[in-house]
């Protein structure tokens, strides 16, 4: 609320109230009001010296100079005759009403009107007018000092190329039109969260040189029926006035979800908004010169009519970057960061598989904050490594008190994961093992792939099952079955999920064959899920459970076989983890060869733990596989 406006209205109310009080007091103090019959008695008694008559109001003055006010009948001849008979001085005055009297009479009305105007102005400030709910909330971006260009976008070359063509079309349409090409009507940016979809759209705004409107998908639907469709119409009306132009809708899945997916009857405001959007994009009336760019990380929930050519002519995939893309992105975010000589961008890029652009931006920022916290003038490689740990696993919880028994359980649990990972085929190299609590995990083993991976082999999956079971088996072998902890709960869940996917999605079961089962498990529409039936019989469901159990049991048996054969290595690694708390992959290999790790006491206290892709266990230990 605007404090200045509120203060003005309070002053006005106070002034009007003061005028009313003063007028009432002046009337009270200036005269005493008596009845008409009392006035007649005073006249007959000779107490009235003079009188002034104005309409029905009589101001009579007594012999002792008191003023009496009387409301008399109109044209009261009897009163005048009696006064004349008693030699009273009688004057007649025209019945005019003073401005103050008028103001006092109008005061209640003025107060009501003032309050109404005040409320209306407040509504106008928040919603572009008292009836401004149907107005578009799209903002027109203008060039400023924070202008983003394609130079600020890295690691998504294909997406940049697609949208660069749109920008070129707006700048020089004749280049394309001479060959019969038409300007694309829309481009849909699709990709996981944090890959830079909105950043690319901002770069288009900076490069295009045409008006750029931006709005969120959630800005369309409000509490009133019909507001969403009205805002869509208003948005395109604004765009037509500024054509050629670009409209960017962020998170379009908020308004563009599949129609007919809800339960129950009644009007669906979101569907009405979507229908209006479909008509405006490619309906009876063409909107020439308006390009619509939208972003979503849920293309599977969008309505098919929204995705067809003529509305969104292009679907631009913005994936997580590969190692080369990560290197470019890191360099972009390092532009304003003073770096020490030991910082190796290529190593950082190789050590961050699966990171999105937002993750990498956060990584660089966390490293800079850590260096500033230590009063350094430059950011070192150690800061980046520690920042990776914080981004992926949370901050260290060195203050957490663990007794010796819990530490020993955790050390052997993590040692079991690491020993199995070193002895199964096609496993990713062990990068780090730690028993320092981080986040919800009391310890972790991290495996880092040697390169980006886009698919997995059957043997890699079975090896991963064995690695996941390694921690629980190690606890059983070292401490006995009766002392197994709940620390492997998330290991068991992750192994079960992997085995179920192997059976139901990837066809790794000879009994069930290469058939996809339970294809509606990820159904995002409640209405569709209720309407559809499960596509597996009870017998097939039992077979699926049986095959899942068989695969998990295979991983358990394989882990038991390896740890039984490598029991000496398990004891060696468990004791080393208790002593050093954090070990790198190279140090683990040296320890198993009988070579103690070579590091200073300071380095041991600030040992760096490399990140992992999937932390599995929040309990007494976690196995992380990449």
Curated annotation (Swiss-Prot):
* InterPro entries attached to this UniProt entry: AAA+_ATPase, AAA_lid_3, ATPase_AAA_core, ATPase_AAA_CS, FtsH, P-loop_NTPase, Pept_M41_FtsH_extracell, Peptidase_M41
EC number(s): the record gives 3.4.24.-
Gene deletion effect? Cells lacking this gene grow more slowly than wild-type, are filamentous and under high-phosphate defective in stalk biogenesis. They are hypersensitive to a range of antibiotics. Cells do not grow at 37 degrees Celsius, or in 50 mM NaCl. Required for stationary phase survival. Depletion leads to increased levels of sigma-32.
Cofactor(s) the record lists: Zn(2+)
- Job description of the protein: Acts as a processive, ATP-dependent zinc metallopeptidase for both cytoplasmic and membrane proteins. Plays a role in the quality control of integral membrane proteins. Absence of FtsH leads to increased sigma-32 levels, which suggests, in analogy to E.coli, that sigma-32 is a substrate for FtsH. May play a role in the general stress response, as overexpression leads to improved resistance to salt stress.
The membrane-topology field of this record reads: Multi-pass membrane protein
Q: What is this protein called?
A: ATP-dependent zinc metalloprotease FtsH
Ranges facing Cytoplasmic side: 1-5, 120-626
Top-rank taxon of the source lineage equals: Bacteria
Family, per entry? In the central section; belongs to the AAA ATPase family. In the C-terminal section; belongs to the peptidase M41 family.
Q: Which gene encodes it?
A: ftsH
Q: How does it assemble?
A: Homohexamer.
Which organism is this protein's natural source? Caulobacter vibrioides (strain NA1000 / CB15N) (Caulobacter crescentus)
């Amino acid at each position: 609320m605007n404090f200045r406006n509120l203060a003005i209205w309070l002053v006005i109310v106070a002034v009007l109230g003061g005028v009313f009080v003063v007028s009432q007091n002046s009337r009270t103090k200036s005269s005493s009001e008596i009845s008409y019959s009392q006035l007649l008695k005073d006249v007959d008694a000779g107490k009235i010296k003079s009188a002034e008559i104005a309409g029905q109001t009589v101001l009579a003055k007594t012999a002792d100079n008191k003023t009496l006010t009387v409301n008399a009948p109109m044209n009261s001849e009897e009163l005048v005759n009696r006064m004349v008979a008693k030699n009273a001085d009688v004057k007649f005055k025209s019945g005019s009403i003073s401005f103050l009297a008028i103001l006092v009479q109008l005061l209640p009305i003025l107060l009501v009107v003032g309050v109404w105007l005040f409320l209306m102005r407040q509504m106008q400030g928040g919603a572009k007018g008292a009836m401004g709910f149907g107005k578009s909330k799209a903002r027109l971006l203008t060039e400023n000092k924070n202008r983003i260009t394609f130079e600020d976008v890295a690691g998504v070359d294909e997406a940049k190329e697609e949208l660069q063509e749109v920008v070129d079309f707006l700048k020089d349409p004749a280049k394309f039109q001479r060959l019969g090409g038409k300007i694309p009507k829309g481009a849909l940016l699709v990709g996981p969260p944090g890959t830079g979809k909105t950043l690319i759209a901002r770069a288009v705004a900076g490069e295009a040189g045409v008006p750029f409107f931006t709005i969120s998908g959630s800005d369309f639907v409000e509490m009133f029926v019909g507001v969403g469709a009205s805002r869509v119409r208003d948005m395109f009306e604004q765009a037509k006035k500024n054509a050629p132009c670009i409209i960017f809708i962020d998170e379009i899945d908020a308004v563009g979800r599949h129609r007919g997916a809800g339960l129950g009857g009644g009007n669906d405001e979101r569907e009405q908004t979507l229908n209006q959007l479909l008509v405006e994009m490619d309906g009876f009336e063409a909107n020439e010169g308006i390009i619509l760019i939208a972003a979503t990380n849920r293309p599977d929930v969008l309505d098919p009519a929204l995705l067809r050519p003529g509305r969104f002519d292009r679907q631009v995939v913005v994936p997580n970057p590969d190692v080369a893309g990560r290197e470019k992105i890191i360099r972009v975010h390092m532009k304003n960061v003073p770096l020490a000589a030991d910082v190796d961008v290529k190593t950082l890029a190789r050590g961050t598989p699966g990171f999105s652009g937002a993750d990498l931006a956060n990584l660089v920022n966390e490293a800079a904050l850590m260096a500033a916290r230590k009063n350094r003038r430059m950011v070192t490689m150690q800061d980046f490594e520690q920042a990776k740990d914080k981004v992926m696993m949370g901050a260290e919880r060195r203050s957490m008190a663990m007794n010796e028994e819990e530490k020993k359980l955790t050390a052997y649990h993590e040692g079991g994961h690491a020993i199995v990972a070193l002895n199964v085929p096609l496993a990713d190299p062990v990068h780090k093992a730690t028993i320092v609590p981080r986040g919800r995990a009391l310890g972790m083993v991290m495996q880092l792939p040697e390169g980006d991976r886009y698919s997995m082999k059957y043997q890699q999956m079975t090896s991963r099952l064995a690695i996941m079971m390694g921690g629980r088996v190690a606890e059983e072998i070292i401490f006995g079955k009766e002392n197994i902890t709940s620390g492997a709960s998330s290991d068991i869940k992750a192994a079960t999920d992997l085995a179920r996917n192997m059976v139901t999605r990837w066809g790794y079961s000879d009994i069930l064959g290469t058939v996809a089962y339970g294809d509606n498990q990820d159904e995002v529409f409640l209405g569709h899920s209720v309407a559809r039936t499960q596509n597996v019989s009870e017998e097939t469901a039992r077979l699926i459970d049986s095959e899942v159990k068989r695969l998990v049991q295979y991983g358990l048996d394989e882990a038991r076989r390896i740890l039984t054969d490598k029991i000496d290595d398990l004891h060696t690694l468990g004791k080393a983890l208790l002593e050093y708390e954090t070990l790198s992959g190279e140090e683990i290999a040296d320890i198993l060869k009988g070579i103690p790790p070579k590091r200073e006491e300071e380095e041991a206290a600030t040992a760096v733990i490399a990140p992992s892709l999937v932390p599995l266990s929040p309990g007494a230990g976690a196995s992380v596989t990449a």
